[in-house]
Amino acid sequence: MKQGIHPDYREVVFQDMSNGFKFITRSTIQTRETIEFEGKTYPLAKIEVSSESHSFYTGQQKIMDTAGRVEKFKNKFGARASGKAAK
């Protein structure tokens, strides 16, 4: 195998931003943030949803609008989305 062409495969902490859950796994993700976890320093990758917060795994329905998607939709399709018929 050629040297220097493969990504750095290392332990990374992923943090679920919706509930704060953290877990360690191995990944090639590139990130500048680090975190102290279980006595060691790891690269930190922030994610919006994980198995700890996704409704399929938790059995609970939860509405998340972290990116303002509802407001963006209402601004774009305001009259049509509110049920008013355009004539």
From Swiss-Prot:
Pfam families: Ribosomal_L31
MF GO annotations: structural constituent of ribosome
Gene3D superfamilies found in the cross-reference section: Ribosomal protein L31
InterPro entries according to UniProt: Ribosomal_bL28/bL31-like_sf, Ribosomal_bL31, Ribosomal_bL31_B, Ribosomal_bL31_sf
GO biological process: translation
Record key words, sorted: Ribonucleoprotein, Ribosomal protein
GO CC entries: ribonucleoprotein complex; ribosome
Signal peptide extent: none
NCBIfam families for this protein: L31, PRK01678.1
Assembly: Part of the 50S ribosomal subunit.
Record family assignment: Belongs to the bacterial ribosomal protein bL31 family. Type B subfamily.
This protein's name: Large ribosomal subunit protein bL31B
Biological source species: Burkholderia mallei (strain ATCC 23344)
Gene: rpmE2
